[in-house]
From Swiss-Prot:
Gene3D superfamilies given in the database record: Metal-dependent hydrolases
Naturally occurring in which organism (per UniProt): Xenopus laevis (African clawed frog)
GO biological process: adenosine catabolic process; inosine biosynthetic process; nucleotide metabolic process
Organism ancestry: Eukaryota, Metazoa, Chordata, Craniata, Vertebrata
Site label Important for catalytic activity, positions: 226
Positions of N(6)-methyl-AMP binding: 21, 23, 69, 101-104, 142, 175, 205, 283-284
EC number: 3.5.4.-
Task performed by this protein: Catalyzes the hydrolysis of the free cytosolic methylated adenosine nucleotide N(6)-methyl-AMP (N6-mAMP) to produce inositol monophosphate (IMP) and methylamine. Is required for the catabolism of cytosolic N6-mAMP, which is derived from the degradation of mRNA containing N6-methylated adenine (m6A).
Active site: residue positions: 205
Annotated gene: mapda.L
Residues holding Zn(2+): 19, 21, 202, 283
Identification of the protein by name: N6-Methyl-AMP deaminase-L
Length: 347
């Protein structure tokens, strides 16, 4: 495949997105809307960086996160962000999305509970508006908050798990991997598992985390985020293989975050050759200026995947969602209905 027809194939391909941080997924267009609401904030200097898109340096990407926190401090902001992000994923052909975000209190008076309620309201409004995407939510534990904040997040997740009509499905463990240790979070994560919540844990994002990774694999998690350096330990690889734990792989994020030096060296190839379950994801589509169609295209070009290989990756990803068996069956039916039209652009 080449040219516009190829790009159209990846756009038309129905896709599953399972590793998308809400704040990191905010697009340039949405950031400009938010900044226009807050003229009192001295962040106009950030406009140049925001407009750079794919040319942003890693440091500028980190600066973007700081600006995002400044301009998303009210319920109105969170509602706008949630709806815009969902609609952008839908426009890119994503049919099932698990968003994740850390509930936070803001100086503007937003509580953690209200934060989650607002995200769920955004999901509901998109559904009412007929946006063609099924969206669920994972509450994220930020490592920087330590075990106390983690316990609060688990309690919130348990409450919403019971009351949200299957919108809240689980928890994410993320944040700066150099802060704290996995053992700090074993108790709240175990409690979450016992409550029926699913666990998606960022593991082995940096080298020399073998001990922590092995500890957290003992839970075990239902999915692994990134897992960039899992392959440095044959013992860890065997544990992951034996338990068939799906990985969430984010190619552009790893390249821009400089944890992987080139597309060819990305661990996609390692796990693909093992026929191990994984799903392609964006991580932070706004900050890293990508989308899921682009991630599939990069993987296909780098690892010589045919359109049928690409289709299989997308279809198999349905099994790695945290959705119910009924939802998975409905998604598979939807994929098969769409398949003939999708492959018209693959020829």
């Amino acid at each position: 495949m080449a040219g516009e027809g190829a790009l159209q194939f990846y756009r038309d391909l129905p896709k599953v997105e399972l590793h998308a941080h809400l704040n990191g997924s905010i697009s340039t267009a949405t950031m400009k809307k938010l900044m226009a609401r807050k003229p009192h904030l001295d962040i106009q200097h950030g406009m140049t960086m925001i407009d750079k898109g794919q040319k942003r340096t890693l440091e500028e990407c980190f600066q973007m996160f700081k600006i995002i926190h400044q301009i998303t401090d009210t319920a109105e902001d969170i509602l706008l962000v949630t709806k815009d992000v969902i609609k952008e994923f839908a426009a890119d052909g994503v049919k099932y999305l698990e968003l994740r975000s850390t509930p936070r209190d803001t100086p503007a008076g937003l509580t953690k509970q209200a934060y989650v309620e607002t995200v769920l309201e955004g999901i509901k409004q998109c559904k009412e508006e007929g946006v063609d995407i099924d969206v669920r939510f994972l509450l994220a534990i930020d490592r920087r908050g330590g075990p106390t904040a983690a316990k609060e997040t688990v309690k919130l997740a348990e409450d919403f798990f019971c009351s949200s009509n299957e919108l809240v499905l689980g928890l994410d463990l993320s944040g700066d991997p150099t802060v704290g240790h996995g053992r700090d979070f074993m108790e709240p994560l175990n409690k979450a598992r016992q409550s029926g919540l699913k666990l998606a844990l960022h593991l082995s994002e940096i080298p020399s985390q073998t001990e922590e990774t092995e500890l957290l694999l003992g839970l075990p998690p239902d999915r692994i985020g990134h897992g960039t350096f899992l392959t440095t330990s044959a013992h860890i690889v065997e544990i992951v293989k034996k338990q068939h734990i799906p990985l969430e792989l984010c190619i552009t994020s790893n390249i821009k975050g400089q944890t992987v030096s080139s597309y060819n060296e990305h661990h996609f190839g390692f796990w693909y050759n093992l026929h191990h379950p994984f799903v392609l994801c964006t991580d932070d589509k706004g900050v890293f200026a990508t989308d899921l169609s682009v991630e599939y295209e990069i993987a296909a070009k780098t690892f010589n995947l045919t359109p049928h290989h690409v289709w299989d990756l997308s279809y198999q990803a349905i099994d790695y969602t945290f959705a119910s068996a009924d939802v998975k069956a409905n998604l598979k039916e939807k994929w098969l209905l769409l398949k003939p039209d999708v492959f018209r652009h693959a020829l």
